[in-house]
């Protein structure tokens, strides 16, 4: 399928035919055409030496068999164009961890190079990476030499080496090393990615750090506080005794959540130092050892720069309302896995234990109903009126104004046709529910209120992403996630019946209706559109299954006139 991409001027410095066969096979099984092209341009031409930071927690407890399985993944990643730099964090078994990491890299058919410290602190308090000062990184990369960085800092003022006390500061300084092109940051552990209450404590699929970091940090802080306080269900003696009996489990649970917090902080700090295209992945050692490229989160992310499944797919529901009790158990009744070998994790699904993270893109939400000269720039004269109703403003974006030139530009480019701006503004002005802007108008969603005054519904009128960014940075997922959170009860949109994106839309909806069907007796019109409906599954069972509701929505959506220049 992708063989033609290796022709027509594309140069790839292959080690042998096996390398080419591996890459083609993997691309066929995992990547879209756009993803394959992006991967080949970036990694497979041999012109750049990309690296990933690899942090493996508790590697000292891993068995020989576990190391063998993981080494296959590291070897595949090297074949596919990216080399590891291994980092250890403080523990009581540093020497054992060094030996295990050395063994892992050797099994990967690479050459380990143990560095006694990672940073050097100068007399003025500044830090410098040893890899930047003491290594020829290009030489190391081309010869398969892999640094293993011990968690120590050399202090020039005392001529001594000390164990790091702040892992986040340590990784912050290491990731600033400009001599290495760090494009990925992988954390492997026992418990997997950052837990999500919306997914029954399975891992977040994707985190846009610029948007979600503070909220997730608060959630983890609250969870840790709940565990630390150790509050019984009641003052009853049996409930208090149960806490005492389960103390060891509670201690393990507390350590696990503190590790999740540190992982989040590490990712936020490191990715902030790297390019906007850099990606982080947190997953289990077992998932990272999968021989299947379609479910191995590390290999899959290298090839596609995304998670194994989309983060905007329907979520699991946690009906208990308890942050660690999807089955109605109390927080201290949750099972805690402390085994580390892979036999205890057989059947583990990579989807549930993996979080992909990016530094992310800025998001602006404009929730005013009217576009006016006070909240919009480049507004046509006939719309330049002043409204003093406070509801027309979004306080969170009071310092920003909507730029209609950029607004129109992204819609024109995304749809491949020209928007009739005056016609469009006449249609939506006064009915705007929200306008979501991603980055510098790299993605946009325009939502309006449609229907009768006493029963309005939210309609996704326009959804656009700049063509060269479609499928990248998770922009579509970010928009749909935010849209569904803002309007959880119901959102409706329409799409041409032959739109190639309809499969993606179908996966995110709970109902689809052909708008050319007979909506009422004798009410049938030609239409090239399908209607998609998304709603909260619990409330939708009552409202959406009622076909009358769908038909009412469909009549309004069917009759919306397009606003394209003819």
UniProtKB/Swiss-Prot annotation:
Disulfide bonds: none annotated. Keywords: Acyltransferase, Amino-acid biosynthesis, Mitochondrion, Transferase, Transit peptide. GO terms for biological process: L-arginine biosynthetic process; ornithine biosynthetic process. GO terms for molecular function: L-glutamate N-acetyltransferase activity. It is found in: Mitochondrion. PROSITE patterns: GNAT_NAGS (PS51731). Belongs to the acetyltransferase family. Residues 391-557 form the N-acetyltransferase domain. N-acetylglutamate synthase involved in arginine biosynthesis. Pathway: Amino-acid biosynthesis; L-arginine biosynthesis; N(2)-acetyl-L-ornithine from L-glutamate: step 1/4. InterPro entries: GlcNAc_Synth_fun (IPR011190), Vertebrate-like_GNAT_dom (IPR006855). Its EC number is 2.3.1.1. It catalyses: L-glutamate + acetyl-CoA = N-acetyl-L-glutamate + CoA + H(+). It is an enzyme of class 2 (transferase). This is Amino-acid acetyltransferase, mitochondrial. GO terms for cellular component: NAGS/NAGK complex. Its main location: mitochondrion.
């Amino acid at each position: 399928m992708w063989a033609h991409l290796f022709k027509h001027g594309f140069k790839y410095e292959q080690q042998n035919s096996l390398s080419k066969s591996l890459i083609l096979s993997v691309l066929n099984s995992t990547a879209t055409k756009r993803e394959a092209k992006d991967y080949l341009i970036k990694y497979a031409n041999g012109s750049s030496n990309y690296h990933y930071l690899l942090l493996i927690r508790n590697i000292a407890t891993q068995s020989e068999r576990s190391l063998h399985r993981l080494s296959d993944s590291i070897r595949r990643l090297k074949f596919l164009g990216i080399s590891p730099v291994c980092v250890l964090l403080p523990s009581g078994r540093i020497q054992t961890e060094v030996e295990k990491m050395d063994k892992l890299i050797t099994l990967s058919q690479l050459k380990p190079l143990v560095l006694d410290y990672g940073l050097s602190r100068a007399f003025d308090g500044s830090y410098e990476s040893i890899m930047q000062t003491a290594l020829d990184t290009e030489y190391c990369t081309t010869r398969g030499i892999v640094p293993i960085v011990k968690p120590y800092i050399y202090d020039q003022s005392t001529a001594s080496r000390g164990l790091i006390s702040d892992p986040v500061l340590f990784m912050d300084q290491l990731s600033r090393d400009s001599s290495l092109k760090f494009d990925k940051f992988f954390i492997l552990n026992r418990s997997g990615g950052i837990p999500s209450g919306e997914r029954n404590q399975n891992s977040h699929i994707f985190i846009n750090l610029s948007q979600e970091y503070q909220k997730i940090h608060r959630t983890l802080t609250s969870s840790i506080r709940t565990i630390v306080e150790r509050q019984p269900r009641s003052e009853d003696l049996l409930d208090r005794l149960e806490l005492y009996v389960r103390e060891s489990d509670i201690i393990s649970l507390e350590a696990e959540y503190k590790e999740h917090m540190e992982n989040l902080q590490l990712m936020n700090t490191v990715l902030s130092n790297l390019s906007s295209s850099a990606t982080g992945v947190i997953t289990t050692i077992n998932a990272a050892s999968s021989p299947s490229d379609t479910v191995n989160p590390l290999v899959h992310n290298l090839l596609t720069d995304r998670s194994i499944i989309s983060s905007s797919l329907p979520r699991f529901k946690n009906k208990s309302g308890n942050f660690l009790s999807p089955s109605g158990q109390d927080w201290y009744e949750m099972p805690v896995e402390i085994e580390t070998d892979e036999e205890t994790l057989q059947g583990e699904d990579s989807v549930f234990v993996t979080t992909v993270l990016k530094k992310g893109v800025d998001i602006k939400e404009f929730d005013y109903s009217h576009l006016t000269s006070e909240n919009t720039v480049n507004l046509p004269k006939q719309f330049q009126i002043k409204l003093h109703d406070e509801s027309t403003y979004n306080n969170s974006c009071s310092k920003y104004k909507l730029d209609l030139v950029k607004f129109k530009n992204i819609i024109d480019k995304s749809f491949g046709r020209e928007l009739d701006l005056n016609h469009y503004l006449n249609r939506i002005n006064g009915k705007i529910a929200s306008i979501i802007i991603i980055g510098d108008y790299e993605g946009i969603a325009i939502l309006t209120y449609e229907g009768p005054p006493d029963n309005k519904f939210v309609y996704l009128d326009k959804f656009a992403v700049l063509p060269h960014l479609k499928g990248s940075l998770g922009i579509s997922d970010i928009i749909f996630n935010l849209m569904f959170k803002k309007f959880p009860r119901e959102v409706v949109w329409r799409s041409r019946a032959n739109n190639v994106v309809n499969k993606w839309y179908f996966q995110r909806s709970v109902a689809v209706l052909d708008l050319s069907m007979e909506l009422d007796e004798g009410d049938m019109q030609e239409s090239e559109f399908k209607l998609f409906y998304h709603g909260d599954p619990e409330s939708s069972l009552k409202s959406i299954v009622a076909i009358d509701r769908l038909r009412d929505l469909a009549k309004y959506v069917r009759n919306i006139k397009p606003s394209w220049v003819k």
